[in-house]
């Protein structure tokens, strides 16, 4: 399980570091940005037999994401939990391999951005319009695929080499 926690911490740090070093703004988002923490939640999901531990990790990560990056209260916790529900449903029907894990990550990133947009719109916090949302969704796909593929390959190889089992 320590490998999974390290992966989540690295992803969380990447969210902050790359936002500082990759020039981007809401009007012109970069092709090399994604939400690494969400991708990590998708990639580690299948390593948990017991979803209770996964949900604890999700709640902690959502809280930290709210506090450190978005300065919102409960927004990311709710969004991360909804993404968990989506991943859980998809995992029941779609096996895990490099192609399907990328599909799940893309769907999770799309869900994150769309839910953020909808929730912020509901509370009249309009920071961008729907066409900008489309650009953000389109441009986040490339890095989502790259990071998911790298993460999945490394975790699969490392985790099964060391533990040869799932997290209990």
Enumerate the predicted regions with their spans:
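Terminal, non-globular segments
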Residues: 1-168
């Amino acid at each position: 399980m320590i490998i999974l926690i390290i992966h989540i911490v690295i992803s969380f740090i990447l969210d902050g570091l790359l936002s500082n070093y990759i020039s981007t703004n809401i009007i012109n988002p970069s092709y090399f940005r994604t939400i690494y923490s969400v991708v990590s939640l998708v990639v580690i999901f299948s390593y948990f037999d017991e979803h209770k531990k996964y949900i604890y990790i999700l709640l902690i990560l959502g809280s930290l994401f709210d506090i450190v990056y978005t300065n919102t209260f409960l927004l990311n916790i709710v969004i991360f939990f909804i993404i968990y529900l989506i991943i859980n449903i998809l995992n029941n029907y779609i096996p895990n391999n490099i192609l399907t894990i990328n599909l799940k990550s893309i769907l999770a990133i799309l869900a994150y951005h769309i839910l953020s947009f909808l929730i912020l719109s509901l509370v009249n916090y309009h920071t961008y319009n729907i066409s900008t949302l489309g650009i953000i969704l389109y441009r986040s796909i490339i890095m989502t695929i790259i990071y998911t593929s790298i993460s999945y390959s490394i975790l699969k190889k490392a985790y099964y080499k060391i533990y040869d089992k799932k997290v209990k």
